[in-house]
Amino acid sequence: MSAIVSKNVIRSITTSFKESLERDSDWCEVSKTSPQNADYGKPLYQKVYAMRYIPAYYFEYCILSYQLNRRAKKYGYEHLEIASLGCGLAPDYYALKGNLIDITFNYSGYDAVHWSTEEFMPSKEANFALNISNASQVAQETIDTYDVFFFPKSISDINDHATDNLEALAEKISSSKKERIFFLNSFISSGCSQVSNVVKLFGVVHNAMISKGFTTSDDHKKTFFGQGPLGRYLISIDSNFDYPPSQRLNCERRDNGKVDCLNCNVIKSPILRNNYIEYNLLEYIKHDN
């Protein structure tokens, strides 16, 4: 058995966001915009971001969720409380929903940015909660309830958002009374040839956990990028990664040669290969003294 990737989730996302984008006429306003904290709040860019990145990120989160399912079942978990820190449009929710088999869960997503285009994502159930909040501001008593912390390509954004954000968050998580905590970490890929600065950021959390008496047999510096060599098409890894060609964005201005759109970020190809995938699952345990 392998990770469950839903064609319906991918098609629903690409269809709804494309239909909304095609009702907008000001694509050029975000043609030079790139993924960063200052731009995530722009609804138009949120739609462009969803079209280009979310299907591939959802694919990656399915792999992580499947691995969590296997690890949690090993210990007999029947229910998990999950916090997604820097959740954005929450594609990890759908990955967890499809891959936690016979394990119920509650999902609490946190993001400092209001992703107003969340309405275009597939429907959710009562186990989903979204909080417009900086991750480091989550109360300790709330942190203490979580079994799983998901960083969906967000740890650098959390670190960059405000001074000492990551340190404050690490202090709270490491102060948890839980005996076992899982981390699902996804990073912007460095090509897996070296430990990138983004991967190193998790060291802040790791060091805090160790300082509070937690141990782990997982290597927090070791990451994975899916099956096969880097550069492999996602559909060759799993045929359910079906990004319909008809859903890709086209611009009449570019087609007619009316403007120079060589570096336009709106009509760039969506992420179809595993180049942007880099992840790990970590388990920390605190034994009674």
Residues covered by each model-derived region:
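Conserved beta-strand signature within the Rossmann-like core of class I S-adenosyl-L-methionine
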Residues: 177-190
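A short SAM/SAH-binding and catalytic strip from SAM-dependent methyltransferases
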Residues: 146-163
